[in-house]
Amino acid sequence: MSALQLTPQAASLAERLADLAVDALIAEADLSPKPALVDRRGSGAHTDLHLGLMHSSALSLWPTFKLMADAAGQFNTVGQPLREALGRLGRDGEATMLRTTQGVNTHRGAIWALGLLVTAAALDARNCAPEAVLARAASLAQIKDRQVLVQGSHGNEVVRRYGVMGAREQAQQGFPAVRDFALPQLQRSRAAGSGEQNARLDALLAIMTTLSDTCVLHRAGIEGLHTMQRGAQHVLDVGGSASLAGRRALNQLDQQLLALNASPGGAADLLAACLFIDGLEPALGRVSRSV
């Protein structure tokens, strides 16, 4: 059962946005076959993750996303107070996630990306076109959270070591992987009659073609990143996941990434962001504007 089915029809805007965020996370986890990622087939390149844990983690974040949307209604403008409220809520949400998963990092990157997007959507529910929401999210991400000292993380270490764009920079630029690659590919594959699951797989692959995925870089270095990018492009070049040649290439990419222990977790987070953005306008036409 999806989060959308758990919320009454008279749901507030904040509740509906939380539903959409959780549903995007669950849809990303369920999508199969994803190369070297947790899906319905198994745990991919991970030893500490499984599909049930991904579901539990996603559901545990519903209150966090709702509170973020509520904060947007409270402050009603992009600025330092809202940015720092989001930071506090995100840290609380991460603590909840870690309690739920017994210390396993399932969705830290997704809390950042989807938290910004939920808040950006709540700031102006009457203008939830992708470009508008992504621009508002970028404005929020560009504001420094003064309550946070610079912290070490695998992602930050990789950004410094390789000089690539990390999750923070991706958000500050308006999620170009979503705006310029995932959403257009999702629409192209749907228009080609590929089917929804294949269209979503193609959107994931489109992200993977150019993303400097810090999860892959951390686990497999430059070799892993190039294998991911070139392999994803090859799948799309031979017809995408709906074609026989594309499925063969996708299976080959899966095996290559597994051999390198490289899991494209950053791309998975951005696919969830893509699915959230894609669902906004259809869903918000059916909800109350009250928060």
From Swiss-Prot:
EC supergroup of this enzyme: transferase
Keywords: ATP-binding, Nucleotide-binding, Transferase
InterPro entries assigned: CitG (IPR002736), TriPribosyl-deP-CoA_syn (IPR017555)
GO terms (BP aspect): prosthetic group biosynthetic process
Gene it is expressed from: mdcB
Family stated for the protein in its record: Belongs to the CitG/MdcB family.
Gene Ontology molecular-function annotations: ATP binding; triphosphoribosyl-dephospho-CoA synthase activity
UniProt cross-references to Pfam families, sorted A to Z: CitG
Name listed for the protein in its UniProt record: Probable 2-(5''-triphosphoribosyl)-3'-dephosphocoenzyme-A synthase
Catalysis performed (reactions): 3'-dephospho-CoA + ATP = 2'-(5''-triphospho-alpha-D-ribosyl)-3'-dephospho-CoA + adenine
NCBIfam families, alphabetized: malonate_mdcB, PRK01237.1
Keyword presence, Iron: no
Entry superkingdom: Bacteria
Keyword Ribonucleoprotein belongs to the record: no
Known role: Involved in the formation of 2-(5''-phosphoribosyl)-3'-dephosphocoenzyme-A, the prosthetic group of the acyl-carrier protein of the malonate decarboxylase.
E.C. number: 2.4.2.52
